Regions:
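Radical SAM/AdoMet-radical enzyme domain recognition
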Residues: 1-66, 72-76
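Auxiliary Fe-S-binding modules of radical SAM enzymes
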Residues: 64, 68, 78-237
Length: 237
């Protein structure tokens, strides 16, 4: 184990507990992050999924908290994982027909450009300067689809994953293996390829064939607004 990713959607205890449905304090997570850094795991990535009206007030507190930590803070646009619709529209559209409003609505998504502008405005007011793009060669290991920025003179890095407002399908290098043994070539598609039985048999050639088949069937572009049947907790992320 060389690096880890931690989901952290708020520093405020009330928001944290409500969003994660847990009975422990956010301080436990923060201590775990510090311990991971102390034992040499690097990079330590912090993923924050931003939902308008729920935790978007936590954007600046998290940016300030991790600014000098050396951790990689990544803001992720809120996405319709675990619901279905028939439209194939891919961009953020507040006028698009809503999915189940208890699960996802287009107006819940805060686009990365808005996130960055809000961070810059808050940073400027605090005299911290503005985010600057990070050279691709300086991006953290396992950077994947995120686009990275940093504050001048700060140890931390800020990334934005913009699946809704500016999809990155052409550069996607991800496959996912679900807990029940299926290879999923695209997070936003329900297409899956079962590798479980081949793994149980120890059939390495069959496993390799299935993985190659999954790679070959990665879609050219996601249809994210269609939603998916599985939730993230079922897919793994």
């Amino acid at each position: 184990l060389q690096r880890i990713t931690v989901s952290l959607d708020a520093l405020d205890d009330v928001i944290f507990r409500r969003m994660n449905d847990v009975d422990f304090a956010v301080g436990d997570v923060l201590r775990g992050i510090e311990m991971a850094q102390q034992v040499g795991l690097a990079p330590v990535k912090i993923n924050m999924v931003v939902k308008r009206g729920t935790n978007d007030g936590e954007i600046l507190p998290l940016a300030r908290y991790f600014r000098h930590s050396g951790a990689v803070l990544r803001f992720i646009e809120y996405m319709p994982i675990g619901d279905e619709r028939t439209s194939s529209h891919c961009a953020v559209d507040p006028h698009a027909p809503a999915l189940n409003p208890e699960l996802w609505d287009a107006s819940d998504t805060v686009p990365s450009d808005e996130l960055r502008a809000r961070i810059n405005a808050g940073a400027a007011a605090a005299g911290l300067g503005e985010l600057e793009p990070l050279d691709i060669n300086d991006a953290p290991a396992g950077a994947g689809p995120a686009r990275y920025w940093h504050f001048p003179g700060a140890a931390g890095t800020v990334g934005f994953i913009s699946a809704m407002s500016n999809h990155f399908c052409a550069n996607c290098n991800r496959l996912r293996l679900t807990a029940d043994g299926n290879v999923r070539p695209c997070l936003f598609s329900d297409a899956e390829y079962s590798v479980r039985e081949a793994l149980r048999r120890g059939d390495d050639m069959q496993v390799l064939s299935i993985w190659r088949d999954a790679v070959a069937h990665k879609p050219q572009e996601h249809a994210i607004i269609e939603g998916t049947q599985r939730f993230m907790s079922q897919i793994g992320g």
